[in-house]
Amino acid sequence: MDAEGLSTDELFCFLQAKRNEDFSYSHILSSMCTTPHPVAVQAHNLFMETNLGDPGLFPGTATLEDRLIRWFADLYHEPSAGGCTTSGGTESNIQVLRFCKKTKNVKEPNIIVPASAHFSFEKACGMMDIEMRVVPVDEQYRMKTDAAGELIDKNTCCIVGVAGTTEYGMTDPIPALGKLAEQEGVHLHVDAAFGGYVLPFLDDAPPFDFSVPGVGSIAVDPHKMGLSTIPSGVLMVRDERVFCNLLVETPYLTTKQAYSLTGTRPGASVAAAYAVMAYLGRKGMKALVTGCMENTRRMIEGMEAFGVHRKVTPDVNVATFEHVSVPSPWVVSYTRKGDLRIVCMPHVTRDVVEAFLSDFGESYVSHIS
């Protein structure tokens, strides 16, 4: 830090220069985040200074969190479900493993996760000294239920299924995992950080929520397909009493106990998530998701017209193909197996899809000729 401060002109000239070094979403095809909706930005700015870590000081903001949780409870077919907002899927997954470990209360706990699980579970297990048992996926990149059953023992505290995998956009067989969880008396957590905003608005989507017996908790991220500001996550639980295992005393706050992982919790991102859902409604969300899925199908159709084959037909708006290079300035990613991965987020409009296909086609044809 310099002895003398900058003028606002100097400061923001520098900041704008740094921002200009960032990639533009107009060419980003790899991210599961997107440009937030204008109402999310407006709501975020309105609630910028609010802190839900001390909700008694911000009762209006706390009411928005309560309403958001009630909306997700209804969306996920369990009106009595409870929940709380988090910073995103990683925090939600950590919280689940915290209460699962405490509930099971064994010396050497383990969890069962698919090979497609998000890396946050590896982080969480390392933090809490939990063994992570990895289940292989089938040819459709879905968790093998039989293999999962073989790994369960008396120390298993949680089974994890994924709804909308990060790499291939697939959904694990949640009903089968629910039966397994009930049979073994183990908590089933569904990581729907991405798919939780997509699957409820699709016709004939694979079941993943509390309508499935055995599902105990669900993680979903408004800062992904919910068009909210970053960071924003929600953790839903079928039975809110599981949070009792996480309570700590907070004597100097307006509430005397808390179960959240973070102390300070931004009310701004909660207001942003609420604003988007209130503004779009179910019809608006369905239209948004439908558009993203149509663009995903167009992307697959266009790539296959060049002879680049899909790896799988996805459940959500993630398209994967055999390994090929992509021309600049397009930003894509590749799976652990080296497959090309493209996420058709709301900023990936039909015009963007067509522009990418045009650039790719020109580059690909010249490369193979």
UniProtKB/Swiss-Prot annotation:
Pathway stated in the Swiss-Prot or TrEMBL entry: Cofactor biosynthesis; methanofuran biosynthesis; Cofactor biosynthesis; coenzyme A biosynthesis
Any Pfam family the entry gives: Pyridoxal_deC
InterPro entries: GrpII_AminoAcid_Decarb, MfnA, PyrdxlP-dep_de-COase, PyrdxlP-dep_Trfase, PyrdxlP-dep_Trfase_major, PyrdxlP-dep_Trfase_small
E.C. no: 4.1.1.11, 4.1.1.25
Transmembrane segments: none
Residues that bear N6-(pyridoxal phosphate)lysine: 224
Domain of life of the native organism: Archaea
Catalyses which reaction(s): L-tyrosine + H(+) = tyramine + CO2; L-aspartate + H(+) = beta-alanine + CO2
Co-factor(s): pyridoxal 5'-phosphate
Entry GO MF terms: aspartate 1-decarboxylase activity; pyridoxal phosphate binding; tyrosine decarboxylase activity
A GO BP entry: carboxylic acid metabolic process
Keyword entries, A-Z: Decarboxylase, Lyase, Pyridoxal phosphate
NCBIfam families listed in its UniProt record: tyr_de_CO2_Arch
PANTHER family linked: PTHR42735, SPHINGOSINE-1-PHOSPHATE LYASE 1
HAMAP family: MfnA_decarbox
Function: Catalyzes the decarboxylation of L-tyrosine to produce tyramine for methanofuran biosynthesis. Can also catalyze the decarboxylation of L-aspartate to produce beta-alanine for coenzyme A (CoA) biosynthesis.
Family of this protein: Belongs to the group II decarboxylase family. MfnA subfamily.
Name this polypeptide is given: Probable L-tyrosine/L-aspartate decarboxylase
Lineage: Archaea, Methanobacteriati, Methanobacteriota, Stenosarchaea group, Methanomicrobia
